[in-house]
Structure formats: C-alpha cells, structure tokens
UniProtKB/Swiss-Prot annotation:
Its EC number is 6.1.1.6. Keywords: Aminoacyl-tRNA synthetase, ATP-binding, Cytoplasm, Ligase, Magnesium, Metal-binding, Nucleotide-binding, Protein biosynthesis. It comes from Aquifex aeolicus (strain VF5). Mg(2+) 2 binds at E508. This is Lysine--tRNA ligase. GO terms for molecular function: ATP binding; lysine-tRNA ligase activity; magnesium ion binding; tRNA binding. PANTHER family: LYSINE--TRNA LIGASE, CHLOROPLASTIC_MITOCHONDRIAL, LYSYL-TRNA SYNTHETASE. Gene3D superfamilies: Bira Bifunctional Protein, Domain 2 (3.30.930.10), Nucleic acid-binding proteins (2.40.50.140). The gene is lysS.
C-alpha cells in the first residue's frame, strides 16, 4: 500500500534507530508529501474548546442523587470491583450500571437503584443494587442531565488519542487541554475515499481538525459526526501505551509535553496551578495592590538567606546574581510612594534539589504600607479562603493521609514556645548557650554542626524538632532576631522580631514580618550578616548600601510576605514532589546513549 522509503528517509530511520511503528509513520509522511498534502498546515478554524462543549451539554447530577432505572441488560462485563451492565430501555437508549450483584445475564430485564453520576463523562449509575421497586425508563433519566445538542455544528481540533475502524465507519477520540470528545466518521457522510484516507494515513497521536454536527450515541456519549477533517500535524512517534499511560518519572519530567498528552492528572495539576495564580492576581487587585516587576539580574545577592547563582555581564564587566528574592526592590517602591505592591515571579537559589526544593521556583511577594504582621495574618487567612473556594470549592483539602482544614482562624504558636514544648529548653538556652545548642544538634544527628554559625544551628534544630507535628495550617510567630536580618524588632522583646512562617503539612509555605525601616538598625543587621559570611555561612546576606540609602529617605511602617506558589500547589494538588507542579523542573544532565558499534 505504501511506497518504499526514499534513501534519505531510510538513512534517517537507521541513524535514529526508529522502531517499526515509527518507520511506518515516516513512510506515511513521505507519501503525504508526494501526494502534495502538507502534513503541517498553517491554520484551522476552531469554534470552541472541547471542555466548553462538554460542560454545556453534560450537567453534573447533584451529589448522592439516587434513582431507580429499569431496562434490559444488553451486555454484562466484569470490572475490577464488580460488573458493568449496559442497560437499555424500549427506545434503545442506554446507561452504564456499575454493580456488585452476581448472576446477571444479557437479555434479561432488571431494575437497579443507585447513585447517578458521570464516569469518564458518561451518565452512569454507580453503587447499584437490584430492587423490586418500580423504575424509570433510561431516556427519562437522561433527559434531566444529558441535554440534546440538536446536531449543533462545531469545528474542533485536538490530538487523536484513540481510533477503531469498523469497516464503513471509524470511531475515535480527540483531546485538547480541556477535555476529550468522541468523533464518528461514516462512509455515507464523508465518502469512501476520505474514510479510506483517514484509516490509511491518520494515526493515534496525530493532531486533527474536524467539522461536523454534535449528536449522542445510544449510550449517551456526546459525539461529533464528522463531515470534514484535516490533518494538522503528523506525529512521528506512537503515544505511551494506552492503559498504563506514561509512568517513567524521569521521562515524564524530561518530556513534559508527553506527560501532558498521556496523563490526565498532569493536566489537572497544571490547570489548577494556572487557576490559582489567576485568582491570586484577582485577590490582590481587589485589595488595592499594584503588580510590578523588579530585576532578576541583580548586582548584590540579598533579600533572603541563600546561596546565589553568579553570572558575568561582559559589557558592564561586572558580576551579577540571579535574584534570591525581590524583597529589597519592592521595599524601595514603598519608599517611592507605592502603598501596596506585589510581584509573582521566579527566584533562584543555588542549593540542593529534593522533593520540596527546586533551584528555580515561583513566589509571590507583597508589601503593604501602614500594616504590621498582625494585619498580614488576617490578610493571609482571607487570601487562602478565597483561593481554595475559587480553585477547589472547599476549605478541606486531602493531602496524603491528612485532611487539612483551612477554616480561619489558623492556629498560632510562638517560636520558642514550640521549641520548649519539644525539647524542654527555654529561650535563654537557645540564644545564650551556644555549646549546649551544638550538643543538642549532635544528639539530633544534624550533620556538620561544628561548622555552623549560631543562627544556622538554631534554624536546623527548629526544622528537626518543631515542624514535624505542624500538619494543619499554623502560624509560627515571633522568631529570634538572629534569624531575621530584615524584620523589625519585636515591640515587647528585643531578642525577637515580628515575624511569622505559615507551616502547612510540615512545609514552610509563607514567610512574613513587620518590615525593618530604621536605616541604622538595618545597617547593623547587614554588618552582622557579613560576620556570619566570614564565619563560613555562604547563605548570609551581603551589604546593600543603596537599600540603606533608600531607608534614609523614610519608609513608612510596612509589612511584607512571600508565599511559595510551588509548595502551595503541591498541597492543593495532593502531590509530595515539587517536580510534579513545575512544568520543566531542574534535572541532572541526561546521559547520552552509547551508539551501536
């Protein structure tokens, strides 16, 4: 049927060690070109996204909506948890029934009672049991929730993810980011030649455009009866095996495009992330915040305690740093008269990679003049309530084995109260007994304690003993000053600062404080950071003279906060790896495969 490979294509197939399936696809591509058909055309008119079409015609039944349905079992098949019955009424309209009842036979009449819900987009009866009570006809049930599309014309495009030929007809499914829909190509509608062309040259994985009319099959599945189609992009590689999807984690992260094609869960996570950021922007706008942009290439590594990435500007002949945090630039804007500002963007920290850390990550930082950290606590609670209601529709979130409750007010606990509860030791021990603290760190099996500064030791001990039991959203408040060089001294205790971290499911999700706006105090804190750096703390901040100068012009009382968007999405999406919520996470260089001798 297909012509032989040209020498050029054949050489390419050998060079890249293509599979037999890939060679066949390459042959098809060559033949399409020989026929004068462009396998990669310029455009296609799309009238709507698939998800919008499905949403319009497939209303979800109310939760736990019970019905009784009668009909004849056209087919009975076993599932993992029981049986699936195709139940049809006198009009031939079908519904899927999922049940654990034994002894069911095709062509027998049954009445089932169960919960009406959609399974893979199809209106179905689940948790169904046989009953002697009178049931309704299937079509009467479907009339309530499966609206008749009345052969509405549509023009849709997507990736072909399934296909089966039945002689005079072809069924398949196309998928875009918003959903999947069945397509139906019929010889009597498109003609024998076009049906044969689709069967011969279109493969699962290809991107196709279809024009036709919507209708429902007897099972109630929303379907496009295709009148015209067009190949929009030929896929030279087969998709991952249908029933198992793409399971290789390394491949999923390196080839995220393939992950998004094959795994509905990956698409769900990144749509959730997009929705979260969209709603976050709306929330800030509602509260009078202005979105701004600050430099990513910065002359001084400051704004947070972290090791920076270093680069070199050839023209300026100077070292620059990828930003650790936008904090000092955002506070300069407060000095300049911007009352409330926020920025959503990338930060970079040249540190370890693990399930909660990626060197390149996304944060939102925001600052409000005339607020203190008490105002931020209330604002943060309100923001989280808003975001969860808009993205998930609930304040209770399943995360691993826990159910997290975001109903305000969140729990609050003081930093040193938590340490005392866990260790029995008070604030003076942690701030004044350095050798005792070092001994405790050794007992906790914290590595490299001899090389750590006082601040680093305290931070590591807190992480080890205090965060383990912080599952529900909890504000840890009133941090030690030695850990917080940019925060304002606590108004009641000079050893502390007015700072909080929001811990959820053991993760630090937010960090905030009443901002230090005294230029003399700030300079002293920077000098202390320089001492820490000289003692070996590579994450200590550098002096920023221009920021001091900005404070000298006067910064009003201000509170600021940073929220890690990646970790927040991890929690809302119920995943335990930050790589699952970053489209293209940082990975080790891919090992090149050895060429065959």
């Amino acid at each position: 049927m297909l012509s032989l490979l040209s020498s050029e294509i054949f050489f390419s197939a050998i060079q890249y060690n293509l599979s037999l399936m890939e060679e066949v696809r390459l042959k098809k591509l060559q033949e399409l070109r020989e026929k004068g058909i462009n396998p990669y055309p310029y455009r296609f008119e799309v009238t709507d996204f698939i998800g919008n079409i499905r949403k319009q015609y497939e209303e979800e039944p109310p939760e736990n909506y019970k019905v009784r349905v009668k009909g004849v079992a056209k087919r009975v098949s076993r599932t993992e948890n029981g049986y699936m019955v195709r139940l049809a009424d006198e009009k031939g309209i079908e519904i899927l029934v999922f049940t654990k009842e034994e002894g069911l036979k095709p062509k027998e009449s049954y009445t089932f009672e169960g919960i009406l819900k959609r399974v893979e987009g199809k209106l179905s009866l689940v948790e169904a049991v046989l009953t002697e009570e009178e049931g309704e006809e299937v079509y009467k049930i479907k009339e309530q929730f499966d609206y008749d599309p009345n052969f509405r014309p549509v023009s849709l495009a997507g990736r072909l993810v399934s296909m089966r030929s039945m002689g005079k007809a072809i069924f398949g499914h196309i998928q875009d980011l918003t959903g999947k829909i069945q397509i139906y190509l019929k010889k009597d509608v498109i003609g024998e030649e076009k049906l044969k062309f689709f069967n011969d040259y279109i493969d699962v994985g290809d991107i196709v455009g279809v024009r036709g009319k919507l209708f429902r099959t007897n099972t109630g599945e929303l379907t496009v009866e295709v009148e015209e189609y067009q190949l929009l992009a030929k896929s030279l590689h087969p998709l991952p095996e249908k029933w198992h999807g793409l399971k290789d984690v390394e491949v999923r992260y390196r080839q995220r495009y393939l992950d998004l094609i094959a795994n509905p869960e990956a698409r769900r996570i990144f749509m959730l992330r997009t929705k979260l950021i969209t709603e976050m922007r709306k929330f800030f706008e509602m509260h009078g915040f202005i979105e701004v942009e600050t430099p990513i290439l910065q002359p001084i590594a400051s704004g947070a305690n972290a090791r920076p990435f270093v680069t070199y500007h050839n023209f300026l002949e100077t070292e620059l740093y990828l930003r650790i945090a936008p904090e000092l630039y955002l506070k300069r804007l407060i000095v300049g008269g911007f009352p409330r500002v926020y920025e959503i963007g990338k930060n970079f920290r040249n540190e370890s990679v693990d399930r909660t850390h990626n060197p390149e990550f996304t944060m939102v930082e925001f600052y409000a003049a005339y607020w203190d950290y008490h105002d931020l606590i209330k604002f943060t609670e309100d923001m989280f309530v808003y975001l969860l209601e808009k993205t998930l529709g609930t304040l209770k979130v399943k995360y691993g084995e826990w159910e997290l409750d975001f109903s305000p007010p969140f729990k609050k606990v003081r930093y040193f109260d938590l340490l005392k509860e866990k260790t029995g030791k008070d604030k003076d021990f942690f701030l004044k007994d350095l050798e005792g603290l070092r001994k405790l760190a050794k007992e906790l099996e914290i590595p490299d304690v001899e090389r750590m500064t006082h601040a680093k030791l305290l931070d590591k001990v807190f992480e080890k003993v205090a965060e383990e039991d912080l599952i529900q959203p909890t504000f840890v408040i009133d941090f030690p000053k030695i850990l917080s060089p940019l925060a304002k001294t606590h108004r009641e205790d000079p050893d502390l600062v007015e700072r909080f971290e929001l811990i959820i499911a053991r993760y630090e999700v937010a960090n905030a404080y009443t901002e230090l706006n005294d230029p003399f105090d700030q300079k002293e804190r920077f000098l202390e950071q320089l001492k820490e750096k000289q003692m070996g703390d590579e994450e200590a901040m550098d002096m920023d003279e221009d920021f001091i100068r900005a404070l000298e012009y006067g910064m009003p009382p201000t509170a600021g906060e940073g929220i890690g968007i990646d970790r927040l999405v991890m929690i809302l999406a119920n995943t335990d790896s930050i790589r699952e919520v970053i489209l293209f996470p940082q990975l080790k260089p891919e090992k090149k495969k050895k060429e065959a001798p």
